[in-house]
Amino acid sequence: MAAVSLTPRALYEEVAELLRQRIFNRELAPGSWIDELKLAEEYGISRTPLREALKVLATEGLVTMKVRRGAYVTEVSERDLADVYHLLALLESDAAGVVAAKASDAQLKELAALHKELEKAVGQRERFFEINETFHMRLLEIANNRWRDQMVADLRKVMKLNRHNSLLKSGRIQESLAEHQGIMNALLARDAAATVQAMQAHFKNGLEAAA
């Protein structure tokens, strides 16, 4: 049997990921104009894959395309932020309720282990962000609804545009950890209603801190 030929990752997808990380790291600031010519020269590519990459980021809400003006890094308004957090609260609390009711003991132990890692990262903001996101995404994987997963992934990309503000509030990391403990306690008790409530409260408090 002949070997299967795998198509390498498209160039525009690689460029999209590079730009995505620069946006998340604030190298490309919210509201800033994206200089296509400069970036194309920097990456040693033509403007075609760069424009395709920008289209991808536009569909994710990270970039805003303006007629005859080009691409700009999206600025998240208070309304945008409230809408994103509202949807995430609905989607992720629903997933959390499913996990509380249906997860295996091994899966709950895995989430508990991630929570322990979160506790250790309290003094390291970036590490806390990383483990926090891992916990939320693993919970979604266990809930096992690929349509919900895709919606959450896109919403979380927009949320990252404002994520640094969410933990700048004094004591917010400790508050977030306490909220995670409440979620974890409800999960381990297999109390779906309490888990849903705890996750919704987590996002409500997160929005208040980020606004």
Stretches with model-predicted labels:
Residues 94-119, 125-127:
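Amphipathic alpha-helical dimerization/coiled-coil segments
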Residues 84, 111, 128, 132, ...:
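Hydrophobic packing residues in well-ordered alpha-helices of helical domains and bundles
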Residues 1-101, 106, 211:
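Short linear motifs at protein or domain termini
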Residues 7-8, 112-119, 157, 164-211:
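C-terminal all-alpha effector/ligand-binding and dimerization domain
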Residues 36, 145-146, 190-191:
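Short loop-to-helix capping motifs
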Residues 87-103, 133-170, 206-209:
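Hydrophobic, amphipathic alpha-helical faces that serve as interaction scaffolds
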